[in-house]
Regions:
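Adenylate-forming
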Residues: 1, 23, 27, 34, ...
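Conserved AMP-binding/adenylate-forming core of the ANL superfamily
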Residues: 7-52, 56, 60, 77-82
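Conserved AMP-binding A3 loop
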Residues: 19-21, 161-187
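Solvent-exposed alpha-helix faces
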Residues: 28-32, 89, 98, 171
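Structural core segment of the AMP-binding/adenylate-forming
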Residues: 36-37, 64-145, 155-156
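A short helix-loop-beta submotif of the ANL/AMP-binding
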Residues: 44, 50-70, 74-78, 87-92, ...
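Conserved pre-ATP/AMP-binding loop-to-beta segment of ANL
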Residues: 51, 133-165, 171-172, 197-204
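Conserved AMP-binding/adenylation subdomain of ANL enzymes
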Residues: 183-208, 212-231
Length: 231
């Protein structure tokens, strides 16, 4: 249970806290950077991240551009990751830095790789080679890159949901691009999900499930963007 004061509205991960305003600012800066990398409405941005504040920031940034965030199961083998990167046609991969060191040959040519520093709570939880914490030479450090971009000020466009690939147990993983909902559909869906998830202003949400799965992803995206504490 977090000991963060009840007045705090934002995301808590381990000992780190990030307010909603900070998350929104970082997401807008990521969106600006992605736009400069050529990401456009309807494109895919792949994310190879454990549960982390950066995951939600990347997801919100991608949605801001009207693009599809594609979470990749980080348990996948390099050839499975390679397949999804090729199948989506993505031009950008955002990943925890330590995961990238074994993927040099799995990342297609032309894909820009952004390395997210692996946070302390993840280092404490998982067995991670400390020699792999630095961003590899074929990737860009996301934190340094983030500081180069002003918040995105482009047009407001329909925002699609993240595209979740299947596990591929009966063949290759499969993903389906659903058209972005209309404003009316979005409003109706948000009312329904708020009721189902029990989200309301000031609520506290905890997310133990992996964000590469559809239900935790849907819940986490909404809890993180609502007036709630996300732990």
């Amino acid at each position: 249970m977090s000991k963060t004061p009840q007045s705090f509205l934002g995301i808590v991960s381990g000992g780190r806290r990030r307010t909603q305003a900070e998350v929104a600012d970082r997401a807008d800066r990521i969106a600006s950077g992605l736009s400069r990398l050529g990401v456009r409405q309807g494109d895919c941005v792949c994310m190879l991240l454990r549960n982390d504040i950066a995951f939600l920031e990347a997801a919100y940034a991608t949605m801001r551009l009207g693009a599809y965030g594609v979470p990749i199961n980080w348990h996948f083998k390099p050839d499975e990751i390679n397949y999804i990167l090729k199948d989506t046609g993505t031009s950008v991969l955002i990943a925890h830095a330590d995961m990238l060191h074994g993927l040099r040959d799995a990342i297609p040519a032309g894909v820009t790789v952004l390395g997210v520093p692996t946070p302390p709570e993840i280092l404490k939880t998982y067995t991670i080679d400390r020699d792999h914490l630095a961003t590899p030479d074929f990737a860009i450090d996301l934190e340094a890159w983030l500081g180069q971009h002003a918040p995105y000020d482009g047009p407001v466009v329909p925002q699609p949901m993240n595209m979740i690939y299947t596990s591929g147990t009966t063949g290759h993983p499969k993903g389906v691009r659903r058209d972005a909902p209309t404003p009316e559909q979005t409003a109706a869906a948000e009312r329904m999900r708020a009721m189902i998830y029990g989200l309301k202003p000031g609520a506290r949400a905890i997310l133990p499930g992996p964000l590469y799965h559809s239900a935790p992803n849907s819940f986490g995206i909404r809890a993180g963007s609502s007036a709630a504490r996300w732990c």
